[in-house]
């Protein structure tokens, strides 16, 4: 069950960002699928789901609880070395956050698909 209408303006904005990364496929044939568009980059095909959010996500695992159904649906797409599954979220302040969906975890990434650096604990 969905909560509200599809975020068409957010999807359009996401496609503009994605076009800087590669070629975007957005066809009526994709309507009703588990993703909003497909992004073709050098060596990788990215399936992207776009969502709106009311707050900043401080922990990638929040995506799993906020968008449980979307995460489950996008995980149906096989994850391989050349296929990526991502959820992009837009806040009311027009800031984007990007998350790569693995089978066992969710990782925050940058707009270019690279992982956000995590803080390292320095011993002692």
Segments from the language model and where they lie:
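Acidic-basic catalytic patches of nuclease active cores, encompassing PD-(D/E)XK
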Residues: 1-28
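Conserved catalytic cores of phosphodiester-cleaving nucleases, focusing on short active-site segments
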Residues: 18, 37-39, 43-59
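Active-site metal-binding core of divalent-cation-utilizing nuclease and nuclease-like domains
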Residues: 20-34, 38-42
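Structural signal for conserved beta-strand scaffold positions within catalytic alpha/beta enzyme cores
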Residues: 27, 49, 87-89
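Short, solvent-exposed coil/turn elements at secondary-structure transition points
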Residues: 31, 53, 91-93
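Short connector loops at helix/strand junctions that flank enzyme active sites
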Residues: 32-34, 43-47, 80-83
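Short, charged, amphipathic alpha-helix that recurs within catalytic cores of restriction-modification
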Residues: 58-81, 86
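Domain-level recognition of nuclease-like catalytic cores that cleave nucleotide substrates
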Residues: 81-124
